[in-house]
Amino acid sequence: MNILFAGTPDPSGEILEYLASNSAYNIKGVITQPDKPQKRGNKILESSVSKISLKYNFPVFKPTNLNDPEFIKDIEDIEFDFLVVAAYGKIIPNWLLHAPGKIPVNVHYSILPSYRGASPIQASLLNGDNLSGVTFMEMSEGLDEGKIIKIFTLDIIKTHNKVSLEKDLCDLAIKNIDNVLDLLFADKILLNAQDDTKASYCSKIKKSDSVVDFVEKADVIINKYRAYSEWPGLAFIHKDVLVKIHDMHLCHEDLSGMPGTIVKFDKTGIYFKTKLGTIVITHLQLPNKNKISSADAYNAYREFFV
């Protein structure tokens, strides 16, 4: 089975690693995002997918423009059955969707048609969902609008954050990708159109999303903490200073006070009263300082927080 793979982040690399290690698949080429300069220093950052491709000596393409004539010619010279896409990061043009001998297959981390778009994992955590999943779909020109091949579901637990949920969804995708590709290759599966009337969408996460307002409900804030754990993180503004939050949890103590204010501060944490419930911050970071515990903050910055 000949495959052209497209992906960029670490979980995509795990899927590629699995396909590469399986003798049933012949990876004819890999498309990934161009290398990027590191913000600090002179190092160049290459994607996980790029590193794995080099490990297996796969032909790697890192186009800045998917419609570049030279790139198109390179792909047209490759014969492949499936284009497998896992979080590549760019819209796939129509010509590439029609390039595989069979179909283009996308691995999407939601139960489509829910959460079409760039941040389905974060969206499910932000909304406090109890269920997520992996949708294998035939790619189309529309945003995650293609026909559904198969859906596999996964329970979301309270300890899930963006990183751990993505890991579990990636494992679920790897567990089932053989079955999906085998059925498609043998033409033994019926694809189903999505119900567009039930579609919901999620946008790209922004750096500004990280700033939390403690006037919100406590469970909403906790869901943001889970969703933004990898990036952009969570922070709050106190006395015009942006303070990063590294660890927080719900307080089960019944504390009174005005929403958005610190109602208790000791070595166990900084307690913020919210619209409903109380949040305890146990690890934080002030600008240009190292990460510290609430006990250290109590000893060094007590006057700042009270």
Where do the protein language model's features map onto the residues?
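An anion-binding loop in the catalytic cleft
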Residues: 214-306
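Structural motif corresponding to alpha-helix initiation and N-cap regions
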Residues: 13, 43-46, 68-72, 118
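A residue-level signal for conserved active-site and pocket-lining positions in enzyme catalytic cores
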Residues: 7, 30, 53, 83, ...
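N-terminal Rossmann-like dinucleotide-binding module
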Residues: 1-40
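Donor/substrate-binding cores of folate-linked one-carbon enzymes
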Residues: 82-201, 208
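Acyl-group handling in specialized metabolite and lipid biosynthesis
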Residues: 203-216
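N-terminal beta-loop-helix "entrance" segment that forms/cooperates
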Residues: 34-54
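Internal alpha/beta domain cores that form substrate/cofactor-binding pockets in large enzymes
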Residues: 2-4, 28-30, 59-78, 83, ...
